């Protein structure tokens, strides 16, 4: 919370957030582990699109692996037991994995937009090896952007507190940097995703006018709409809560600030939900992933492996 002397952690809010984080951890680890296995062992023909999705799965898997520590933090009413270094490491990995995930979501949207709307551009000839190089640069850039804001993540003198990501009022460089970066991390990817997906839909509507092609158009529309809705659902509430936090910091109302701080805790935990929902997008976009998740689902239900659909092609690719 931004002002420890103004409000104490809410037991109800902390417990709810801790339980939600625990669920996100379990589902995120399972879904993204299956996605990673599918990428490594079942996708045979690689394109840049698949490389970016692989990196997205890695970022989501890293994020999900960090969530047990954050869940324990909330379930213990925000008491921290892993020291200053542990606090720094948790903040770094959470912020990095979330930033990288958002960057690769934008990269996927841009790649699809260029291939569908501007298919003759030379950038569409990018090889998988070049896409790996681009992915490495994205990771390095996000590391460089994440580090300056980590000065905020310092434990208290007794090493039993680990300040949250949410804004505080001291106006230091690290606070300003982190808030500006958080704003850009939402606005830029969201704007790019909306723009690219709208362009894809317009292009497909012009090309798929025949009645027999309408089912393909409808599937494409559903997929791009799903991507936009999931992004907004997970990140927009947290973005708005941070805006409200800045507003109420200047009003001097401790009660209002407490309510907004608790809202920030809840909406902040929702941003990690995207690591759980991204595998839904994989499943929606490829029969290979539908087959993998179907196998896991039937195994968990004790029914053994599901039969492959008649039109299943194990040499699936992303074009």
Swiss-Prot record:
Residues 1-16, 74-91, 153-180, 241-265 are extracellular. SUPFAM superfamilies: Family A G protein-coupled receptor-like. The chain crosses the membrane at residues 17-37, 53-73, 92-110, 132-152, 181-201, 220-240, 266-284. It is found in: Cell membrane. One of its GO terms (cellular component) is plasma membrane. Induction: Up-regulated in prostate cancer. The keyword Oxidoreductase does not apply. One of its GO terms (biological process) is response to molecule of bacterial origin. This is 12-(S)-hydroxy-5,8,10,14-eicosatetraenoic acid receptor. It comes from Homo sapiens.
């Amino acid at each position: 919370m931004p002002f420890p002397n103004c409000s104490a952690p809410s037991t109800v809010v902390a417990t709810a957030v801790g339980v939600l984080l625990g669920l996100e951890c379990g589902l995120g680890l399972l879904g993204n582990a299956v996605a990673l296995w599918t990428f490594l062992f079942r996708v045979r023909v690689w394109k840049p699109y698949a490389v970016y999705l692989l990196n997205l799965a890695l970022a989501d898997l890293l994020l999900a692996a960090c969530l047990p520590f954050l869940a324990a933090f909330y379930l213990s009413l925000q008491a921290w037991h892993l020291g200053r270094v542990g606090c720094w490491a948790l903040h770094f990995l959470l912020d990095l994995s979330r930033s990288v995930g958002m960057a690769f979501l934008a990269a996927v949207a841009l790649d699809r937009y260029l291939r569908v709307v501007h298919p003759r551009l030379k950038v569409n000839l990018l090889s998988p090896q070049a896409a790996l190089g681009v992915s490495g640069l994205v990771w390095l850039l996000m590391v460089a952007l994440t580090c300056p804001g980590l000065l905020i993540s310092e434990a208290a003198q007794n090493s039993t507190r680990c300040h949250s990501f949410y804004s505080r009022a001291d106006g230091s460089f690290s606070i300003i940097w982190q808030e500006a970066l958080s704003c850009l991390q939402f606005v830029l990817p969201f704007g790019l995703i909306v723009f690219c997906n709208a362009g894809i839909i317009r292009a497909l509507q012009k090309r798929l006018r025949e009645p027999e092609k309408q089912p393909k158009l409808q599937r494409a529309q559903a997929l791009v709409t799903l991507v936009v809705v999931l992004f907004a659902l997970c990140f927009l509430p947290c973005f708005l809560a941070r805006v409200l936090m800045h507003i109420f910091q200047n009003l001097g109302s401790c009660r209002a600030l407490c309510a907004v701080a608790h809202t920030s805790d809840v909406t902040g935990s929702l941003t990690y939900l995207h690591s759980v929902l991204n595998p839904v997008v994989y499943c929606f976009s490829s029969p290979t992933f539908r087959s993998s998740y179907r196998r896991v689902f039937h195994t968990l239900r004790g029914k053994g492996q599901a039969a492959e659909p008649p039109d299943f092609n194990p040499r699936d690719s992303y074009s």
